[in-house]
Amino acid sequence: MMSFEIKEWFNAKELEGMPGVPKLATNITRKAVAEDWVKRQRHGGKGVAYEYHINSLPEETRRAIKGASLSDKPVHTSIVHTVDERLIYAMSFLTPDEQAAAVEIIRVAGIKGLMPTIVSKDKALEALGITVEQQKTLQTLQALPPEKVREILSQYEGKEHNFPVRENDVKKAV
């Protein structure tokens, strides 16, 4: 499995020209002080220099760094590497504890096991624009024999929705 790390600490000089931060290193340092970025002292240079943690940087800057980190990698012909890279990228947004938990869930239950921890079924359906009433309608339809479902759905062909919108519509048809 291919793996790579996204760098976590950046000095002001490395951040020059990045989106979301000033163009000059001195102004980046001022912004870091004003916004209280997490920093550590950098050793080996003249005077006092700091590196700033990626999680302290503006969102726009973090996205650019993470995007550049992925795009700097050679293009792979194997789909496995593409999936690996996307998974690594997604995991980079998690804390170390969340990463460990996600890896364990995937190891035990596969990627399907991870989904309920990310988003509930109700939230996923809501994101798709499926209302609670539509969910109830679907559950009612699923409980019926297939021939009855076909009969009910045939009544809605050519209509605006092509399906019963409310649970009561199904109950009336039964």
UniProtKB/Swiss-Prot annotation:
Species the sequence originates in: Escherichia phage D108
Expression induction: Expressed in the early phase of the viral replicative cycle. When present at high concentration, negatively regulates its own expression by binding to O3 (PcM promoter). PcM promoter, and thus Repc expression, is blocked by Ner. The host SsrA, the ClpXP host protease that degrades Repc, the Lon protease, and the stationary phase-specific sigma factor RpoS are all influencing viral repression in response to either temperature or stationary growth phase. Decreased availability of host SsrA in growing cells would favor latency, whereas starvation would favor Repc degradation and hence induction.
Residue numbers spanned by region Recognition by host ClpX-ClpP: 170-174
Main location: host cell
Keywords: DNA-binding, Early protein, Host cytoplasm, Host-virus interaction, Latency-replication decision, Repressor, Transcription, Transcription regulation
Subcellular location: Host cytoplasm
Domain HTH Mu-type per the UniProt entry, residue ranges: 6-73
Family according to the record: Belongs to the mulikevirus repressor c protein family.
One record GO biological process: latency-replication decision
Subunit structure: Homodimer. Three homodimers assemble as a homohexamer.
UniProt xrefs under InterPro entries: DNA-bd_dom_put_sf, Mu-type_HTH, WH-like_DNA-bd_sf
One MF annotation (Gene Ontology) recorded for this entry: DNA binding
Gene Ontology cellular-component annotations: host cell cytoplasm
Keyword Cell cycle: no
Function (record text): Promotes latency by binding operators O1 and O2 in the enhancer/operator region, thereby repressing the transcription from the Pe (early) promoter and blocking the expression of the genes required for replication (lytic growth). Competes with DDE-recombinase A for binding to the internal activation sequence (IAS), which overlaps O1 and O2. The outcome of this competition determines if the virus enters latency or starts replication. Makes the cell immune to superinfection by repressing genes expression of any subsequent incoming viral genome.
The protein's name in its UniProt record: Repressor c protein
Cited PROSITE patterns: HTH_MU
Record's comment describing the protein's domains: The winged HTH N-terminal domain cooperatively binds to the enhancer/operator region of the Pe promoter. The C-terminal domain (CTD) regulates DNA binding by the N-terminal domain and degradation by ClpX-ClpP protease.
